């Protein structure tokens, strides 16, 4: 057996925690004003009707209603909140 550890093993052994990005409310779900809909880095998804954009690009509902994901042209997506009937 080796009397020294393998060089790699002493330098490895760290891993940062995930940042919990992604979708928090899905299409068709009911939201209240202020609810976070999507956490992201940059505008992967753009804000649509009744959706606000936070400083860190978090999308949140401005009114109470139902979430709807939509397309903006061919390559962009947006999320909107429409009042529940």
From Swiss-Prot:
GO CC annotations on file: cytosolic large ribosomal subunit
GO biological process: translation
Matches recorded under InterPro entries: Ribosomal_bL27
Record key words, sorted: Ribonucleoprotein, Ribosomal protein
Region of interest: Disordered: 1-21
Superkingdom of origin: Bacteria
Any one GO molecular-function label of the UniProt entry: structural constituent of ribosome
Family in the record: Belongs to the bacterial ribosomal protein bL27 family.
HAMAP family named among the record's database cross-references: Ribosomal_bL27 (MF_00539)
Protein name, as recorded: Large ribosomal subunit protein bL27
Organism per entry: Geotalea uraniireducens (strain Rf4) (Geobacter uraniireducens)
């Amino acid at each position: 057996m080796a009397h020294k550890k393998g060089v790699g093993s002493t330098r490895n052994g760290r891993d940062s925690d995930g940042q919990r990005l992604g979708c928090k409310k899905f299409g068709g779900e009911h939201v209240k004003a202020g609810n976070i809909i999507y956490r992201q880095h940059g505008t992967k998804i753009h804000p649509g009707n009744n959706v606000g954009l936070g400083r860190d690009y978090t999308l949140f509902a401005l009114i109470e209603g139902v979430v709807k994901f939509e397309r903006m042209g061919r390559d962009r997506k947006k999320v909107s909140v429409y009042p529940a009937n």
